[in-house]
Amino acid sequence: MISTNDFRTGLTIELDGEVYQVIEFQHVKPGKGSPFVRSKLRNLMTGAVIEKTFNAGEKVPKAHVDRREVQYLYNDGDNFYCMDMETYDQFPLTKEQFGDAINYVKENTNLWVLFFKDKVIGVELPNFVELKVIDTPPGIKGDTASGGSKPATLETGYVVQVPFFVEVGDVLQIDTRTGQYIKRV
């Protein structure tokens, strides 16, 4: 059990049999009444975000989430196969379990799979990945001054907005949290 006074961003707690991660929290001490903690929580199984208010000092059960490093190997259309980096066991993940990670991983990419009570609840990516541009319209000379952008298709099939100077074959750094172009590598 953990006190709501000890909430930190990223902490995982268990509510109603579900696992939630604390996204935001705020300790509030009103002039009248007892203090409370206002929090924003993400359900790690469904991805839904809820707002919940706790009394200050209230005890909630801490969720023990196991984070294992894996290497993405390949997919067969419906399943995404990964290998545990400690035991070298291979196991499949469904599209739903893999989530948005589909847009950012290529074969042999290392990532983390989150387990709760031996059940996969999510996939955690590195903050930045490097992907190659396979298709983008050519930039027109003089367009760079306007600071505009154009779409570029990456090797995973993901489409991202990039500056005009980016060309086919360039390797780009992409932020997996926002899905945005960071820089050309």
Swiss-Prot record:
One Gene Ontology cellular component annotation held by this UniProt entry: cytoplasm
Localization: Cytoplasm
Which Pfam families does the record associate with it? Answer: EFP (PF01132), EFP_N (PF08207), Elong-fact-P_C (PF09285)
* Gene Ontology MF terms: translation elongation factor activity
Point out the coiled-coil segments of this chain: none
Whether Cytoplasm counts among this entry's keywords is yes
InterPro entries cross-referenced by the UniProt entry: Elong-fact-P_C, NA-bd_OB-fold, Rib_uL2_dom2, Transl_elong_fac_P/YeiP, Transl_elong_KOW-like, Transl_elong_P/YeiP_cen, Transl_elong_P/YeiP_CS, Transl_elongation_fac_P
Its pathway, per UniProt, is: Protein biosynthesis; polypeptide chain elongation
Listed HAMAP family = EF_P
Briefly, what is this protein's role? Answer: Involved in peptide bond synthesis. Stimulates efficient translation and peptide-bond synthesis on native or reconstituted 70S ribosomes in vitro. Probably functions indirectly by altering the affinity of the ribosome for aminoacyl-tRNA, thus increasing their reactivity as acceptors for peptidyl transferase.
Task: Fetch the NCBIfam families from UniProt.
Answer: efp, PRK00529.1
Put simply, this protein is called: Elongation factor P
Can you name the source organism? Answer: Carboxydothermus hydrogenoformans (strain ATCC BAA-161 / DSM 6008 / Z-2901)
